[in-house]
Design a protein with these regions (language model features):
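Juxtamembrane/disordered regions of integral membrane proteins
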Residues: 2-152
């Protein structure tokens, strides 16, 4: 059995992947992500108000999706270096689990506490919002990563 070379990524356990993803997310563009989340939530709330009804939980959920999608995608597209960032760029779909799961947890809490959803409805809402963030983050890493490799 040969030892992996320095350029080769050793396989990480699921727990180690979450730790590395958390480390990479610490370098996320949080101000930009927060602004995107606020704009999306405000726009969604304005559209609902124009339609004649107040839908705060829906607007907040849309804002959470924008917040975590921009944070996750921005993390992968930033030019920061480090082992965690290198791992995240090389494994964008595995990295995307972190922002997707975080969005799902926040949306679940919002929909159960503020919204009219019960536990089952809140879980369904959380899963599909998390899936959207997962897809957008993974796509940003895949497309942005391939463009960076092609340009280099």
């Amino acid at each position: 059995m040969s030892a992996p070379t320095r350029n080769e990524d050793p396989e990480l356990s699921r727990r180690e992947e979450l730790t590395v993803s958390s480390s990479a997310m610490s370098g996320a563009p949080w101000k930009t992500a927060g602004a995107a989340g606020a704009i999306v939530a405000g726009g969604d709330l304005a559209l609902h108000l124009a339609g004649g009804h107040l839908a705060v939980p829906t607007a907040l959920s849309a804002g959470v999706v924008a917040l975590f999608a921009v944070a996750g995608g921005g993390t992968l597209l930033r030019s920061q270096s480090g082992r965690a960032m290198r791992w995240a760029r090389n494994h964008p779909w595995r990295f995307a689990l972190m922002p997707g799961a975080a969005a799902a947890v926040v949306v679940f809490v919002l929909s159960v506490l503020i919204g009219s959803s019960g536990l089952i409805g809140g879980a369904f809402t959380a899963v599909w919002h998390g899936a959207v963030v997962y897809g957008l983050t993974g796509l940003a890493g895949t497309v942005g990563g391939s463009r960076k490799r092609r340009d280099a």
